[in-house]
């Protein structure tokens, strides 16, 4: 009889903990939604190009591929140095390639910088932008066009708690900007020197 009581009490405690976690998570999501709901829509060259390129990738069914040749579609992998080359070459991207294309189209990077610095890798791109003078900013000061830097991942802040992301085939083919998963915990946020 005591074992049954202990099991019941333990089960009730686990249920209470699960409910508390759901409530806290939901409250955080609601607070984030409320925080960003009044954020002004700011368009700049980065967000304009992020939307334009992401829409093109969605409409043309781009695949996801990483610089180390891992693919999740038909096994043919290739990443182009520029967005224009991707239109007639491989229809693949990864998070860093997408961000690099956006920054090239917005005038912040060149094709040669992309090639010379191997910017198809998120961590390489993050290091290069930092070296190039992009400013690290606090999360509370985030603005559309800022670069969200995670460990091994990179995205573009689109405003109102949303991001332009190409970190998986799902995100390449998902309407953008999509809701940010702050649970990934950005390591840093970078802003272009002139924004």
Regions from the language model: what does each represent?
Residues 23, 27-38, 48, 59, ...:
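Aromatic- and glycine-rich peptidoglycan recognition patches
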Residues 15-24:
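Hydrophobic alpha-helical membrane-insertion segments, chiefly the h-region
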Residues 27-112:
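N-terminal capping segments
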Residues 108-129, 156-161:
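Short, basic/aromatic beta-hairpin or loop at an interaction surface
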Residues 145-146:
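Structural motif
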Residues 1-14:
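N-terminal Sec-pathway targeting helices
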């Amino acid at each position: 009889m005591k074992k049954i009581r202990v099991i019941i009490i333990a089960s009730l405690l686990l249920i209470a903990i699960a409910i508390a976690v759901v409530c806290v998570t939901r409250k955080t999501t609601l607070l984030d939604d409320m925080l960003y709901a009044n954020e002004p829509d700011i368009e700049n060259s980065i967000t304009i190009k992020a939307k334009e390129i992401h829409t093109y990738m969605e409409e043309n069914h781009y695949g996801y591929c990483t610089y180390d040749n891992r693919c999740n579609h038909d096994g043919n992998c290739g990443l182009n140095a520029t967005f224009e080359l991707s239109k007639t070459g491989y229809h693949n991207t990864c998070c860093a390639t997408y961000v690099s294309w956006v920054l090239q189209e917005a005038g912040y990077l060149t094709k040669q910088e992309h090639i010379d610095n191997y910017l198809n890798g998120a961590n390489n791109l993050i290091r290069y932008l930092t070296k190039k003078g992009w400013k690290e900013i606090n999360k509370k000061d985030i603005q559309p066009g800022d670069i969200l830097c995670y460990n091994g991942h990179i995205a573009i802040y689109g405003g109102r708690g949303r991001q332009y992301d190409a970190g998986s085939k799902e995100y390449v083919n998902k309407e953008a900007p999509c809701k940010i998963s702050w649970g990934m915990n950005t390591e840093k946020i970078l802003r272009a020197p002139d924004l």
